[in-house]
């Protein structure tokens, strides 16, 4: 009969690496509700000092208050991300708080209209917030992160912007804006490599948000904002360089 193998006890204590997010300064746009609010809350719970940006001042202050009540650190900065001057003011305030470590671009609008009746105003607002706003914030974050040689960026697109996925009528402007976000993220990853800046894009399917309920009340969401926020935190807390430039589709969690 074989003798049992004796267990060797190590006198060296097991050491776990500290969370990357702990004590980092993180900026979340679209932080007044939905994915943005859930992400800001989750980042604060992970130890980050979170700057929350959105147009709705009252809702933004509500999310900020709940984060602080839970013991987190949060700074609200009302901002229209489609306005270049407003984004410049936002990043000036961020710079006053410290070195920016992470950016999550969750600001977005969703307006449904038949293609033949899509007005120029709807087209410009949708691309202005979803694509131009993401560009302006990523450009400013890139400039802030590059001198430090480190930075992590997460953008939010949609399955509607992913090639060969199911598309829905009335979302021409939205779909185009999300295709653009995916391409923008790839470009940031290419140029960010030499500066230690990584960028990934998440493309969730239907998420249970107020925005989606208004646009398509009949659609049954398979994801919650918390589902997306948890993945964002996990990504930011991990080395992003190996997957920088990737677009990660998120399907139903049901």
List each language-model region with its residue ranges.
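Substrate-binding pocket helix/loop in short-chain dehydrogenase/reductase
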Residues: 114-115, 122-127
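Residue(s) in the substrate-gating loop at a strand-loop-helix junction
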Residues: 158
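The beta1-alpha1 cofactor-binding region of Rossmann-like NAD(H)/NADP(H)-dependent oxidoreductases
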Residues: 57-58, 78-89, 120
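Active-site-adjacent segment of SDR/Rossmann-fold oxidoreductases
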Residues: 166, 187-197
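C-terminal helical subdomain
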Residues: 3-7, 194-197, 201-202, 217-254
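Active-site helix of classical SDR
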Residues: 138, 174-177, 185
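Conserved glycine-rich cofactor-binding loop
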Residues: 25, 32-33
């Amino acid at each position: 009969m074989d003798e049992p193998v004796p267990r060797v006890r190590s006198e060296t204590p097991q050491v776990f690496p500290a969370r990357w997010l702990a004590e980092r300064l993180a900026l979340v746009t679209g932080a007044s509700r939905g994915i943005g609010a859930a992400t800001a809350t989750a980042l604060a719970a992970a130890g980050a000092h979170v700057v929350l940006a959105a147009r709705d001042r009252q809702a933004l202050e509500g999310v900020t208050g709940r984060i602080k009540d839970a013991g987190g650190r949060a700074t609200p900065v009302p901002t229209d991300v489609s306005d270049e001057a407003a984004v410049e003011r936002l990043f000036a305030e961020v710079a006053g708080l410290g070195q920016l470590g992470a950016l999550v671009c969750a600001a977005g609008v969703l307006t449904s209209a038949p293609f033949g009746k899509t007005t120029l105003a709807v087209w410009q607002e949708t691309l202005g917030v979803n694509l131009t706003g993401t560009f302006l914030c990523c450009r400013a974050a890139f400039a802030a992160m590059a001198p430090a040689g480190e930075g992590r960026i997460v953008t939010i697109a949609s399955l509607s912007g992913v090639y060969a996925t199911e598309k829905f009528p009335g979302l021409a402007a939205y779909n185009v804006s999300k295709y653009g976000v995916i391409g923008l993220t790839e470009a940031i990853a290419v140029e960010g490599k030499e500066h230690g800046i990584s960028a990934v894009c998440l493309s969730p399917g239907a998420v249970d948000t107020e925005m989606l309920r208004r646009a398509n009340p009949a659609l049954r969401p398979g994801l919650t904002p918390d589902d997306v926020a948890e993945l964002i935190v996990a990504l930011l807390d991990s080395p992003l360089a190996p997957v920088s430039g990737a677009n990660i589709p998120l399907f139903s969690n049901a």
